[in-house]
Regions:
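Beta/alpha (TIM)-barrel catalytic core signal, keyed to glycine-rich beta->alpha loops juxtaposed to Asp/Glu
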Residues: 1-123
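Conserved small/polar residues in nucleotide/adenosyl-binding loops
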Residues: 124-130
């Protein structure tokens, strides 16, 4: 048994009550939209709208993270990725993968390069800084 809900660095609502139930009932989360419609790849930074991107094609349907707070969080997460020399998308996916209540992370690659980047997350190791 599992639950399929959205979960990402920008959408952590699952952690409020549901994560505890997942662990207790051994019913893991299948996290979808782990890259928050592409916002956690960095492709929409500074107002950019790449050709054939979801935001370019479907615009108003995916504005959930285009808020002031959403954009601020995206920039802060991007800074963290850069500081630690991490690929932004991979850091975002790994965050989901490392949660004890997550069974699997559902990816949605459009290109072969995106698929390779996403698969490489399985072989990526994050360590906590020692300071």
């Amino acid at each position: 048994m599992s639950v399929q809900n959205p979960y990402s660095l920008l959408n952590r609502t699952y952690e409020i009550g549901l994560a505890e139930v997942s662990i207790r009932e051994e019913s893991g989360l299948l996290a979808y939209s782990p890259l928050a419609f592409g916002y956690l790849t960095g492709k929409y930074r500074n107002g950019e709208l790449p050709k054939n991107s979801r935001m370019k094609l479907f615009g108003d349907q995916f504005l959930r993270y285009k808020t002031k707070n959403g954009q601020l969080a995206i920039e802060k997460y991007h800074e963290i990725a850069n500081k630690h020399e991490l690929n932004f998308a991979q850091m975002s996916l790994k965050f989901c993968e490392l949660q004890p209540f997550v069974t699997s992370v559902i990816i949605g690659a459009t290109t072969m390069d995106q698929l390779k980047t996403d698969i490489a997350v399985s072989y990526t190791h994050l360590t906590l800084p020692t300071t």
